[in-house]
Curated annotation (Swiss-Prot):
It is found in: Cytoplasm. This is Probable transcriptional regulatory protein WRi_002620. One of its GO terms (biological process) is regulation of DNA-templated transcription. NCBIfam families: PRK00110.1, PRK12378.1, YebC/PmpR family DNA-binding transcriptional regulator. Coiled coil: none annotated. The keyword Secreted does not apply. Residues 1-22 are annotated as: Disordered. It comes from Wolbachia sp. subsp. Drosophila simulans (strain wRi). Belongs to the TACO1 family.
Length: 246
């Protein structure tokens, strides 16, 4: 019986992993579709689409699915229309979160996001309820192993970006710029250093809260994980980071 139980657990775990992978593919396809609809179908002329395709390839989304998503978005194929919506809310202990969604039913998504917040010790707020705690900037991220920091820094100075910094913990180089300059800066870095790991508009906290309490870390992790598990939620940003106790 023990062997049977173990096999069942393995099957259950694989089923859960397959479901997560399928959900991730769905979200990637949705982002490709929206990016292609909003701009040109050529990724070299549509940076958002280029970034979406790059992210999809990293996750091994099949090429035919990428091509079909672009074709459906730019052709006369009847399909669902998605809109970008941003939700703001508080997590446990007054933490602040901004939730980014692509949805074809804003009432459904709002209801589900509100339910997750309340179930996990937080509450969904009105527009503007937490965004004042953040700066809205352009964000460009490169892996540290692939690009020399000094070269990035020098290029950033030339382009008059807000900041270029090293994130040693994550092994990343992070560039931020003014919203109005984002397109120009993103394209200039792409031309010199290739496709970044991430390039999008982002809400960066004015004051980052460092959290070391294990119970609070667990609560916030559970909240963010459940939000990002929602089919309509693309990603979540917050004003906190987890640190180890000394």
């Amino acid at each position: 019986m023990a062997g049977h139980s173990q096999f069942s657990n393995i099957k259950h775990r694989k089923g859960a992993q397959d479901a997560k992978r399928s959900q991730k593919f769905t979200k990637l396809i949705r982002e490709i579709t929206v990016a292609a609809k909003q701009g040109l179908p050529d990724p070299e002329l549509n940076p958002r689409l280029r970034s979406a395709i790059f992210a999809a390839r990293k996750e091994n989304l099949p090429k035919d699915k990428i091509e079909t998503a672009i074709k459906n978005a730019t052709g006369n194929v009847a399909g669902e229309n998605y809109e970008e919506i941003q939700y703001e809310g508080h997590g446990p202990s007054g933490t602040a979160l901004i939730v980014h969604a692509l949805t074809n039913n804003r009432n459904r998504t709002a209801s589900e996001v509100r339910y997750i917040f309340s179930r996990k010790g937080g509450n969904l707020g009105e527009t503007g309820s937490v965004s004042y705690l953040f700066d809205h900037v352009g964000l460009i991220v490169y892996k540290a192993e692939g690009v020399n920091f000094d070269d990035l820094f020098s290029h950033g100075i030339e382009l008059e970006v807000l900041n270029v910094e090293e994130n040693d913990k994550e092994g990343l180089h992070v560039i931020t710029c003014e919203i109005k300059d984002f397109g120009k800066v993103r394209d200039a870095f792409y031309a010199k250093f290739g496709e970044p790991e991430l390039a999008r508009l982002s809400w960066q906290p004015k004051d980052l809260i460092e959290i070391s309490d294990k119970e609070l870390i667990d609560k916030l992790s559970a909240l963010v994980e459940e939000l990002e598990d929602n089919d309509d939620v693309q990603y979540v940003e917050g004003n906190f980071t987890f640190v180890d106790k000394l």
